[in-house]
Amino acid sequence: MNATSAVRCRRAGFNPPLLILALALTGCLQPQQRAEEFSAASWPARREALQSLDHWSLQSRIALSTDEEGWSGTLTWRQDENYVDARFSGPLGVGGFRIEGVPERLELETSEGEHFVFTDPEAELAAELGWRVPLASMRYWMLGVADPQSGDAEETLDEHGRLEELEQRDWTVRYTSYRSFDGDTLPRKLVMENDDLRIRLAVDDWELGGPRL
């Protein structure tokens, strides 16, 4: 069931926090139209198109922080429908991991050889650390659109009719930069945050409609 969105237009050993980052990355980013084609009137159609796209890959820098600590590194992400293959490398290759699978069953392997299987990732993470990360929603938030399965959302569009800020499930997502990648205008920088976590992405490259995994 699609979310009902209120749109405003405006001018102008294995470290548990790495587990948070790995699980939080089960979202996706997707293409948008050229900036000159954007408008508030075209947003509903573009929202639906973005929510339906599911074959892509990206390379990005990523940083995660809590009130006490922070982590950063690089991310290589491949999405094939509901199947994800994401690889994180920390500074100098330290603290890396790979996560792959579908939302109902995710496997995580660290650079130290540790292996984890999650059959209910969001609930298991909440039980482990007391922080509930909206994993399924992040797939859509990173793409630049509200999660169609997660109820009402409040969207703010920028002067070009692109998503600038999103509020959903007690999270705020801010899109601070867009850029053209091979003719498609995509989120370049975004921040996802709630009272417990802050996740920043700076995307360096996209490939759309690539070979399936």
Model-assigned labels for residue ranges:
Residues 83-132:
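An acidic-aromatic
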Residues 29-32:
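Bacterial signal peptide processing site
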Residues 25-27:
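C-terminal motif of bacterial Sec signal peptides marking the signal peptidase cleavage site
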Residues 75-78, 99-101, 176-180:
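Extended lipid/amphipathic-ligand handling interfaces
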Residues 46-68:
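A short, Trp-centered hydrophobic/proline-enriched beta-strand micro-motif
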Residues 16-17:
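Short, low-complexity intrinsically disordered segments enriched in A/P/G/S/L with frequent Arg
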Residues 144-213:
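Gly/Pro-enriched, hydrophobic low-complexity segments
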Residues 1-11:
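N-terminal secretory signal peptides that target proteins for export/translocation
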